[in-house]
C-alpha cells in the first residue's frame, strides 16, 4: 500500500510543482500566489534571509521531471527549496535587473534579463569608495537622443538604513543625492514612468543596483559649522509669514537648513574634484550623535543619526549692535563695515580656544542678519572669508535661509520653488533673488564662495570664486525653472551647463590638509618653495614636498589666466627641483603680452606658496653678486615684504666663505616677538652684523673640531621675519629665535651644486626681508 502522503500527491496537479532551477516566465499573465520575489525575501526582521511563510502552490505550468516517480511504490525525494544567501549576490554587483512582475524572482544562478529603461549611472562605478556623507549621482534612462522620457527615480537602501527618496527624470536625465552611512551602502535605483508598461506594479522592472563604500576621513581637520547669535538674540531668522506657519523660523530649523546646505557644499565639491581627475576628496565636518535631520521622516520616527555638528555660539554684542548700519557691509557709508568679521572671529576664537599652531576652519552663519526695508539693505550681514593664525573663518548672513532645504527630500522642491520674493519680509539680495529658488542659489552658493576664501582660494576668472554660484541649482536638478534674474524660461540643464569650482581652486584643495583622505601618503612637514637665480638666466625652483603648479600673472592682472601644472598623469614623477627660463614661460602667454612684466606664484605639493614679483628681474644680472674673490654669487628670492616704514636693504657676505683661513665659530641671534638681527662671529674675534642688535640675544655655537658650517636657514615669515633658525652640515638645527609660530615656515637650502656664502634682505625697526646668497 502506498504511503499516505502519496495519496495526497496524486490528488495534486502536476502544475503545483516546479523544478529547482525553473525560471519559466510564460505565465506572467496568470494568477500568481507563489514564492515572493527576492525583494520580499530581504524585508523581514532586518535580515536578508528567506521568509518563513509556507510557499503556496503556483497555478502555472511547470516541468514535470519531479513527477516521474508518483506511481512508484518508493517515493522520490522532494525537491529542495532554493536558498537565498544572507548577503545576496545581486546586491553586490552593478547593473540592472528585471523584477519580472507576476513571478517569483529567479534563482541566483541564472542570468537576469536587463531592462533597457533601467537607470544608467554615469559618474559612480560599482564598489566605488567615497569619503563624504552626501554623494551626487547622475545618469540617464535608455538613450536620451532617441527617447526623452519623463518619470521618477526612487533610491532606496537594501538595509532600509535611510528612507527611500524620489527624484525627477527630465528628458531621460536624472540627478540624485544619496545619503551614505559608513561602510558598504547597497542601493537600488528604480525608474517608473507613466509612459512605460508595468509602471504601477509593486515589483519594479526597471532597476539598477549599486554598492558604494563610504569611509569617514577622520585624519583631516574638520570644517566647523557655527550659528552665531547676539547675546540677546531670540534665535529666529527672516522668513515670510506663510513659510513661518508651515515650517517656523526657529533656531532648530536654522540648524537643519544650515546643515543641509553644508551637505550640498560637500557633495558639489567632491563631484567637482572627481570630474577634474583629483579623486573623490573633500572636506569633512565634525559630527555628533543627535536627532536625525537628513530626512523629514527622522523626527516622526525618532531616528538618531551621526550628523554634522552645528555649534551655536553667542557673541558679546546685542542684536541691535550687530544690526547697526555702520557695520552693514552693504552700506556704502558704513564706518566699520568690516567689524562683523572681527566680532565673529573673536567669538569663534573664544569658543574653540585653539592651541598655538592648531588650525581651526570655521564657517559661520550670522543668524541675526535682517532685511531692513526702510533703509533698503541687509543689516547684521557680511560676506567675508579669510583669517590668519589659528582661525580660518568665513561669515555669511541668514537673509536667504528660509529658502534653503531642511531635508534631503526638500532639495528638488527648494531649487524648483518659483514663489516670488516678498521684499516686505525678506531680501532680494543683489537683486538676483527674485524667486525662492534663486534666493537659495545666492545664499548657499555665496556662503560656499566665502568658505572657498577660508580654504585659501582667491577670486578667479570663472567658477564659484567669480560668481557662478547663481546657477548652483543646476548641480542638483535636471530642469531649471523660470529665472527672474535672466528672464529665461528654463528647461533641461546638463552637466556641461552647471557651475563649477575653477581648476586652480581644486588644485589648492588637493594640497589642503582639510581635504586629506585615507590612503594619502603622510603630509610633508616642510611645504616651502624656494627660487634660486643661477647661471645663464636660469631660475632653479626647489620644494622638498614637490612642485605642484605655477600661476603666471601679467602686469596689471589680479586674476590668474595662465598656469602650468607639474606631476600630472599616471606615470608622472613629483619634481622637487625644476629649472625655469623666461623664454619658456613667456611662450605660454598670449603673443601680444609676452613683453609684459611677469609675476609668478609657485605652489608646492604640500600647499606652500612662494611669490616672485618680477621674474625677469630675478633671472637677470641684478640678482648676481660679485664676491671679494672675484667669483659671482646669486641672491635667492626673498621672504618678507620689505614694506615697513624706514625699511632699508642690508647684506652680508660671510668672511668664512671667501677667505678660507677665517673660521666661523658662533652665530648670535637678536630677537623679541620678531627677528632684530643676526651676528656672525669668527675665530679671530671679528664679527659681521645683519640687521640690528636689539631684544634678547641667543647664541648658537658651531663645532669647529668637526668642521661644522652653516648649510641653510629655516625661517618664519609673513609681512616681516618672525623667527629664524640655523641648519648645519652635521644635520643639526637650532631653535627658532623670535616668534616660532608666527607667519608661515620656509626652508632656505641651496640647490644641489651650490653653497651658502651670505645673507641679504631689509631692515626697519626689525628685519622685514631675508634671503640667502649662494655660489658654486
Role assignments for model-derived ranges:
Residues 1-109:
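Fungal intrinsically disordered, low-complexity serine/threonine- and proline-rich regulatory regions
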